[in-house]
Regions:
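Core catalytic alpha/beta fold that binds nucleotide/phospho-ligands
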Residues: 1-251
């Protein structure tokens, strides 16, 4: 996870072009130069730095034959908008890692994994309450209040939004499921050194939308997101294979 304020300070202290040459593929440098809005420019750069670092960790732990410079890795996008790793300099025999990128407020976050994955970070904002009916059903609201009584409604919504976003990103369908097509069914506490203070949200496709899932046999009947609330941000990770939770790489 990268503090975008820190990134902004780094840009002010050194030549941004040099920073971009270190982290971005030439095609990505061209893309960044086209982003004129300062906030979008910073978020995009922060997301690319995060995902490159996550990829380098993944490749190192996958015994890739040589360390790959960040600038040699190129992130492209599928027609759906999903970020993908261009094979490029990667070993042709290895499975191309799956990636996911997110940013909100002052942070950017990314993950790389051997299976389809989704990551999301969401700042706790009052605007979520104004659009609550678009992503949180009454049943889900009651479930959150019942199992997380120590949190207020805005924190409930922040966690739910992040969790659903992570699941949407991890589901490999032609079109992402809608927020209300995913139903929160269960909340579990996660204990242990790998999940300090974490929560496990279990989702299922809403009744009547199961047909969307029948197009592929690679997805489980349920989806789980590891969720936490940290300094006013909801952070969520979904992997298509929950057994991979100990082995993912994020930055």
């Amino acid at each position: 996870m990268l503090d975008l304020d820190h990134l902004r300070a780094c840009i002010l202290q050194r030549d941004e072009a040099a920073l971009c040459r270190e982290w971005l593929h030439p095609v990505e440098q061209e893309k960044l130069s086209s982003l004129r809005h300062q906030k979008r420019h910073l978020e995009w750069l922060g997301g690319r730095i995060c995902v490159k670092e996550a990829l380098r960790c993944f490749l190192k732990n996958s015994r890739h034959p040589a360390e790959v410079p960040a600038a040699h890795l190129q992130i492209i996008h599928a027609a759906s908008g999903r970020p993908l790793v261009h094979q490029g300099v990667l070993n042709g025999d290895m499975v191309i890692p799956h990636i996911s990128i997110s940013h909100s407020g002052k942070y950017a976050l990314a993950v790389a994994a051997a299976a389809p994955c989704g990551v999301d970070i969401q700042e706790n904002r009052e605007t979520l309450g104004r659009v609550q009916e678009r992503f949180c059903s009454q049943v889900e609201g009651r479930l959150l209040m019942r199992f997380l009584p120590g949190l207020d409604s805005s924190e409930h919504l922040t966690l739910l939004w992040a969790a659903k976003e992570s699941v949407k990103k991890a589901v490999l369908l032609e079109s992402m499921p809608g927020f209300l097509e995913l139903e929160l069914r269960r909340i579990d506490l996660r204990h242990g050194p790998d999940h300090p203070g974490g929560l496990l949200f279990t989702f299922a496709f809403a009744l009547g939308n199961q047909g969307k899932l029948s197009a592929t046999t690679t997805h489980p009947a349920q989806f789980q997101a590891l969720v936490c609330l940290d300094h006013g941000y909801g952070i969520a990770l979904c992997l298509s294979s929950p057994s991979l939770f100990p082995g993912f790489h994020y930055a």
